[in-house]
Amino acid sequence: MPSVARGWWPRRAAAVLAALLLAALAACGDPASGREDVAPAGGQPEPRQGGGAAAAGPAGALAAYVERVKRAQAARAVAARKWGLKLTPLAAPPPPTAAEKPKITFRKGFGVGDPTLPPVFTTVPTKERIVFLTIDDGAEKDPELVRMMDELDIPYSAFLSDYLIREDYGYFKKMQRTGVALHNHTLNHRYMPALSYAEQKREICGQQDVIEKRYGTRPPLFRPPYGNYNGDTLRAARSCGVKAVPLWAAEAFPDHMEWREWDRDLHPGDIILTHFRGREDWKGSMADMIRYVMNVVTAKGYAVAKLEDYV
């Protein structure tokens, strides 16, 4: 879905027109499911019909934005049918402005005694019905995944380990060109708590250097292998520019989900983990995994948003 700068009109002005948006997007239909009520998760604003490009000020900007949303959702419905999804993925609400971004803090019980270190969290604090999709390591390099996600316009973030991606850095460059942010999953995917501070720093900061050299950006996010870390892990990560450490609330496979919480369900802001894997490791392909997780997410009334817009 196209991103739109949000600084030029207040979010509360959008809320005033939310009901009109729902009606407009309902007209788009849902070719993948046969339903007629396709609306964005969390509700999105819609101007009066017939305002046209001549409308000025916030209402005009809103009209242009919603028109783009409608076109994107119609294209997503076509892609959903092509890729075999049962339901058309919902459109995420507009991202927050920089001033509106939620404050990320340590999940309760996940701290290491120093609240100034990069926070470890599994869920982004939000009331929107959105979740975030993240893919780890880089073992499987399926070109179908890049095409599928680009055509479906579903955002995701990749957490990469150099020992797996070095055989084909170009694959992840193609992914990056579609808008995917590439983050740090260490050089060699070692168990961090068993390493000294110096060894952990080499693993984490070395991967920061690799990603910056190969892809032009120094990642602000880091995920430790297996989700295991200690105080040295976070101190080492902070020393080379890491701002936050997203773990996960659920994990996706081609045929099932695994859950962190007792209720075995999604919640607003949950981070979903999956891996770059194929039929050698899974009962299915990367595309099968995306079909499964997106059908679950959409059926539960959630949209996938871009993690970097909120963290």
Can you annotate each of these PLM segments?
Residues 117-125, 166, 282-311:
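C-terminal domain-boundary segment and adjacent tail
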